[in-house]
Every structure is written in C-alpha cells, then in structure tokens.
Amino acid sequence: MPDATLSNTSLGRLAWLWLTVLIVAVDQVSKYYFENALSLYQQIIVIPDYFSWTLAYNTGAAFSFLADGAGWQRWLFALIAVVVSAVLVVWLKRLGRDDTWLAIALALVLGGALGNLYDRVVLGHVIDFILVHWQNRWYFPAFNVADSAITVGAIMLALDMFKSKKTGETVND
C-alpha cells in the first residue's frame, strides 16, 4: 500500500483541480442554458438599470479584443490558453502544502481558461450571457462564469504577490 504522505507530496496541490473541474462544469452548463433560453442579443432584465441576462458571441478575447479578425485569432487565443493552462498545472503541482490561497487562485484561473478554450475550439466563439450596466448609459461588456473565475483568480494572485512582498516571504519558483 503506497504511503499517503508520499502520494500527497508527489501530487503537490493538484487536488485543487477539483475546483477547476467544477468551474468548467458550471461554466459550460450555464452557457448551454442561456444559449438555449435566449436568442442572440436578447436581454432579460433581472435588476432594472443594473443587471440583465443576454446572449452574445465573442470571437475575440477580453472586451472583444481582435473580434473583427478574419478567424486567425481563434487559434491564437486557443494556443495562448493551452500554454497558460500547462503553466498553471505545473505551477499548481509545485506549490507547497501551505499555499492554499495560491492553489485556489490558480485553480480558478485554470478553470476559466479551460471553459473559454472549449468554446473557442468547439464553437469558434465564446458564449457570454452576464450583462452589467448602469441605466441605458453605460454597459460593461458581456461576460460569463469562466471570465468571472479568471478575474477572481487573478485578483487573488495579485493579492498574494503583494502579501509576499510586504511580509518578505520568498515567492515559490
């Protein structure tokens, strides 16, 4: 019977991949629901003047960056997502036992990246359905669960970096 301590050490923090799988699952189920419940650009007001459900397709990156490209951007962003995902898995595996905050952050970013990667490769676009706005004057670009996970994970990574600098901790390589 293998030693449980050795097993945990060799896996590093890969046990946090369950969070990645959960993010991908919630992301894909929510996208499937809204794609089947709404027509393109239809809005359902949830909180008047602030929050709506909608259906939008994004062929670009964040904020529709390069969305008007001829299709090459699909594969560029897919390649970037694959490389970033591989780096995140290696980073996650190398984390120490006490790096729970960082492990959660990496798992969130990885889940978001994989959720949007699936859309980009299989559908040719990313499905967005969350629309935050202020009256009819200001609209934040539509986004999805994967985008939210990436954002929360990135904020957690930034906070971890500032905490490490402030306390003089060494940053894990």
From Swiss-Prot:
Catalytic reactions on record: Release of signal peptides from bacterial membrane prolipoproteins. Hydrolyzes -Xaa-Yaa-Zaa-|-(S,diacylglyceryl)Cys-, in which Xaa is hydrophobic (preferably Leu), and Yaa (Ala or Ser) and Zaa (Gly or Ala) have small, neutral side chains
PROSITE patterns named among the record's database cross-references: SPASE_II
Cell compartment(s), UniProt: Cell inner membrane
Active site as annotated: D128, D147
Taxonomic superkingdom: Bacteria
Pathway recorded for this protein: Protein modification; lipoprotein biosynthesis (signal peptide cleavage)
EC number: 3.4.23.36
GO process terms (BP): proteolysis
Keywords, comma-separated and alphabetical: Aspartyl protease, Cell inner membrane, Cell membrane, Hydrolase, Membrane, Protease, Transmembrane, Transmembrane helix
GO cellular component, one term: plasma membrane
InterPro entries given in the database record: Peptidase_A8
Membrane-spanning ranges: 14-34, 44-64, 72-92, 98-118, 139-159
A GO term, aspect molecular function: aspartic-type endopeptidase activity
Membrane protein topology class: Multi-pass membrane protein
Similarity comment text for this entry: Belongs to the peptidase A8 family.
Protein's job: This protein specifically catalyzes the removal of signal peptides from prolipoproteins.
Entry protein name: Lipoprotein signal peptidase
Source organism of the structure: Pseudomonas syringae pv. tomato (strain ATCC BAA-871 / DC3000)
Gene: lspA
